[in-house]
């Protein structure tokens, strides 16, 4: 009978299952359970022997009590604190913590709060990277040294990982049990102080929702905090403190706020000096004082989105790691192993009377031994200020290397390079060049953008092109140019495109395309406000703050730094013929479009001149160079006669429209005709362009 259940395959599976079941009935595979807990045969035998004539229930109770005693011996409340956290005080005794410099005030204030009789729970509030955790480590070191009030001289600071309290809590009540064990551990030790980094995470941590009745960590800790049964040190940022802790009034009043501000540049240098020995020992790299100062100065200037001392320490660590990788230390174990192998080879060579070979091996052994002696605990590399500059350049992509002779010459010649690309606008080029030289040489005030300029002039004379060339010359690519067409910012909601929407409006959480977000990601940029006269007046109001203070606050309250940007506004309003006598007339015309306080914020207001035919001679050469770049991809060379250039200038010259008509003529008469010729002669390697019968002709070779 053909049956899906009863066939040979099913029979074999059934027989195998029966064999497994029979095997499980053997003595070695039996499992024993008492009150739902699995016990081994040895534990059962011991329990039976201890139980004697007692009933099964009494024997089970005895077993549970024995198990609880064993658990208490192996992982009691005191041990539980060690399981879920680090004893910072013990680490301070063992010398495992970095020294804490310049935070005596905050450490003293934290110690005073801890020594209170009630509400002795300090919470360190400060932005990310200012050293909140370091202050707690400094307090642990102060306890070890005895530089604290008598009330807390015997305290042990336990850094608790909140995630370890939640780990493995798959059943209802397991998390609450962990918290109770934590509280009991603190009570039994009588001298433990818990440290919660990122303490805002305790809000709702472990809770499963209001309907289930399961409480979170903060709800369980509140009674113990109010009675003074446990003492907690917390650390969090200003935003998280405002958004989480302050919303819970009952929790807030149990903590005492200790503000942690960013240290000054001078204090940060002292901090780096204090931890220098640790980094030198770790990386085997010498770190002089001027390197430490460069870490602070360059990180302040080029990493504005982060705070001291964290960013300066990171720059120092990255630099030392980079130098250490370039000068790897001698592997002592491998070298000694190699010496041992060579000793054996030498003995074999001597036994075989190969004395020349033995002598060569001895020389190699001597070389390895010298290498071991020379590398014994000595620094193999010395960091320089130039190394710090290279690190900043790798982190930010900004060319900030220390100015050498080549850099100085490059700064001197920036105006010449820009003039070669921007034809006929020497005044504008010189004004922008002066601002760049002043900034790169370090002689600007540092509290405003590198430069802010208003370019006024007719269309097609190079206003936008100067901004593009400036981005390429300074930052190496045209992507450093942030171009905003002000015709898109003429409505009343345009401000949201600049700084993002405010709370309560659609798009509040998505500000990725705003100007402030672009500058935050690329703080070194050229910002071009094209045709600024078309912008909404609210946009101009925002620019007042940017050009005066060098910063702007976005819709989410973040302060964005514009101090490393160049701001260029272009306008067609009030342009004249470029004569000095007409400058007052130009300002008069611009006042019809812009308020005086807006015009007064610019470093310079530059009039772009009309282009004459002499200027177009240089422009046509630039346009033809662009054509040659395209032809190079095809392996084609090009020669253009002077007659052809003159013909292009004559056809493309328009005083009112500037260089754009010339660009169109080159596009139509040169690029298009070369394209047509190439399609008919795909093997062409060279083209000549000339004028015949008042027409441009292309001939190939």
Curated annotation (Swiss-Prot):
The keyword ATP-binding applies. Residues 81-332 are annotated as: I. Residues 47-57 have a biased composition (Polar residues). Residues 47-79 are annotated as: Disordered. InterPro entries: AAA+_ATPase (IPR003593), ATPase_AAA_core (IPR003959), Clp_ATPase_C (IPR019489), ClpA/B (IPR001270), ClpA/ClpB_AAA_lid (IPR041546), ClpA_ClpB (IPR050130), P-loop_NTPase (IPR027417). CDD domains: AAA, RecA-like_ClpB_Hsp104-like. Pfam families: AAA, AAA_2, AAA_lid_9, ClpB_D2-small. One of its GO terms (biological process) is cellular response to heat. SUPFAM superfamilies: P-loop containing nucleoside triphosphate hydrolases. Residues 336-371 form the UVR domain. One of its GO terms (cellular component) is cytoplasm. ATP binds at residues 126-133, 457-464. The keyword Chaperone applies. Residues 58-72 have a biased composition (Low complexity). Residues 383-575 are annotated as: II. Belongs to the ClpA/ClpB family. ClpL subfamily. This is ATP-dependent Clp protease ATP-binding subunit ClpL. It comes from Staphylococcus aureus (strain MSSA476). The gene is clpL.
């Amino acid at each position: 009978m053909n049956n899906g259940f009863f066939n040979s395959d099913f029979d074999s599976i059934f027989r195998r299952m029966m064999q497994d079941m029979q095997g499980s009935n053997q003595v070695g595979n039996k499992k024993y359970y008492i009150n739902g807990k699995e016990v081994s045969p040895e534990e059962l035998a011991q329990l039976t022997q201890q139980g004697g004539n007692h009933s099964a229930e009494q024997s089970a109770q005895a077993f549970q009590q024995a198990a609880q005693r064993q658990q208490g011996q192996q992982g009691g409340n005191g041990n539980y604190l060690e399981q879920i956290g680090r004893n910072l005080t013990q680490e301070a005794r063992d010398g495992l913590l970095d020294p804490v410099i310049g935070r005596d005030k905050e450490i003293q204030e934290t110690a005073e709060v801890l020594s209170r009789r009630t509400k002795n729970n300090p919470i360190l509030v400060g932005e990310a990277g200012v050293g909140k955790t370091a202050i707690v480590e400094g307090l642990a070191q102060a306890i070890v040294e005895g530089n604290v009030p008598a009330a807390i001289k015997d305290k042990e600071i336990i850094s608790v990982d909140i995630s370890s309290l939640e780990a493995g809590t798959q059943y209802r009540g397991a998390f609450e049990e962990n918290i109770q064990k934590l509280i009991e551990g603190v009570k039994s030790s009588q001298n433990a102080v818990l440290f919660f980094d990122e303490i805002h995470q305790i809000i709702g941590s472990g809770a499963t929702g209001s309907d289930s009745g399961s409480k979170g960590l903060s709800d369980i800790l509140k009674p113990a905090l109010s009675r003074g049964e446990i003492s907690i040190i917390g650390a969090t940022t200003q935003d998280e403190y405002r958004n989480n802790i302050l919303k819970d009034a009952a929790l807030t009043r149990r903590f005492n706020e200790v503000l942690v501000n960013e240290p000054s540049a001078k204090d940060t240098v002292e901090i780096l000096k204090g931890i220098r020995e640790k980094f030198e020992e770790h990386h085997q790299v010498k770190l002089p004082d001027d390197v430490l100062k460069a870490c602070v100065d360059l990180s302040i200037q080029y990493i504005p989105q982060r705070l001291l001392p964290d960013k300066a320490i990171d720059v120092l660590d990255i630099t030392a790691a980079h130098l250490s990788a370039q000068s790897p230390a001698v592997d002592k174990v491998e070298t000694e192993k190699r010496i041992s192998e060579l000793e054996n080879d030498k003995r074999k060579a001597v036994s075989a009377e190969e004395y020349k070979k033995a002598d060569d091996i001895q020389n190699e052994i001597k070389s390895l031994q010298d290498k071991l002696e020379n590398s014994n605990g000595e620094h193999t590399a010395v960091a320089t200020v130039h190394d710090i500059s290279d690190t900043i350049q790798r982190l930010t992509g900004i060319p900030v290397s220390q100015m050498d002779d080549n850099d100085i010459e490059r700064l001197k010649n920036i105006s010449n390079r820009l003039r070669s690309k921007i034809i006929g606008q020497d005044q504008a080029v010189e004004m922008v060049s002066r601002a760049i030289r002043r900034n790169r040489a370090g002689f600007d005030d540092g509290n405003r953008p590198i430069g802010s300029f208003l370019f006024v002039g007719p269309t097609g004379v190079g206003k936008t092109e100067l901004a593009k060339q400036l981005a390429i010359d300074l930052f190496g690519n045209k992507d450093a140019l942030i171009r905003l067409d002000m015709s898109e910012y003429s409505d009343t909601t345009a401000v949201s495109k600049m700084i993002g929407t405010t709370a309560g409006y659609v798009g509040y959480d998505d500000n990725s395309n705003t100007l402030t977000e672009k500058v935050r990601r690329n703080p070194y940029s050229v910002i071009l406000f094209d045709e600024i006269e078309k912008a909404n007046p609210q946009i101009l109001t925002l620019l007042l703050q940017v050009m005066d203070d060098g910063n702007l606050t976005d819709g989410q309250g973040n302060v964005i730094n514009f101090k490393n940007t160049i701001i260029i506004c272009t306008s067609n309003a009030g342009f004249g013929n470029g004569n000095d006598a007409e400058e007052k007339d130009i300002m008069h015309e611009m006042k019809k479009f812009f308020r005086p306080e807006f015009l007064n914020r610019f470093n310079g207001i530059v009039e772009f001149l009309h282009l004459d035919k002499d200027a177009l001679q240089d422009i046509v050469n630039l346009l033809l160079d662009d054509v040659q770049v395209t032809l190079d991809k095809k392996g084609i060379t090009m020669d253009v006669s002077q007659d052809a250039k003159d013909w292009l200038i004559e056809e493309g010259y328009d005083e009112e429209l500037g260089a754009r008509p010339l660009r169109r003529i080159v596009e139509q008469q040169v690029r298009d005709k070369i394209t047509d010729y190439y399609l008919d002669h795909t093997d062409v390697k060279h083209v000549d362009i000339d004028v015949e019968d008042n027409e441009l002709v292309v001939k190939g070779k």
